C-alpha cells in the first residue's frame, strides 16, 4: 500500500536581499610553471589580479599552494614538470599588496585560496598555455 506524505518546501533564500550581494570574479582551477602551464607562477597571479579577479586558487598538478608568497611545494616524484622550469613566487611585499588591493592601486584585493592542488600529478608535458 502506498502512503502519500505532504511536504512543505520552503525557499531558504526567500529573505535574502539580492541587491545587497555582490558577484565575485573567481578562478578555482589555475595552473602555472609549477606544473604544466607556460606562464610563471607569480606572473599568473599578477595577470589574474590585473584582469580584475577577486579570488584565485592556484591548483597545479602535484603542487600544494601554501600561499602566493611561498615556494610552491611539489609532491616528490609525482610532480615532474616544475623540475624543468623553476617557478618564482611573489615577494612578501607583492603578496600583501595584492591581498589588500594596493598593488598597482587597483583599490580592492584578491583572495588567495590556499592548499589547492590537482591530484593527477604525473604530468610530463606543458598542456596549458
List the model feature ranges, each with a label.
Residues 1:
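Active-site microenvironment of metallo-dependent hydrolases
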Residues 4-129:
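A metal-dependent hydrolase metal-coordination microenvironment
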Amino acid at each position: 500500500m502506498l502512503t502519500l506524505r505532504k511536504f512543505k518546501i520552503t525557499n531558504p533564500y526567500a529573505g535574502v536581499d539580492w541587491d545587497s550581494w555582490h558577484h565575485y570574479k573567481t578562478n578555482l582551477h589555475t595552473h602555472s610553471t609549477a606544473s604544466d602551464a607556460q606562464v610563471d607562477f607569480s606572473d599568473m597571479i599578477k595577470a589574474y589580479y590585473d584582469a580584475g579577479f577577486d579570488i584565485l586558487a592556484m591548483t597545479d598538478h602535484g603542487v600544494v599552494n601554501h600561499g602566493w608568497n611561498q615556494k610552491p611545494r611539489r609532491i616528490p616524484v609525482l610532480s615532474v614538470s616544475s623540475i624543468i622550469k623553476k617557478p618564482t613566487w611573489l615577494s612578501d611585499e607583492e603578496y600583501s599588496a595584492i591581498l589588500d588591493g594596493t598593488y598597482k592601486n587597483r583599490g580592492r584585493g584578491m583572495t588567495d585560496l590556499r592548499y589547492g592542488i590537482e591530484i593527477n600529478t604525473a604530468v610530463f608535458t606543458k598542456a596549458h598555455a
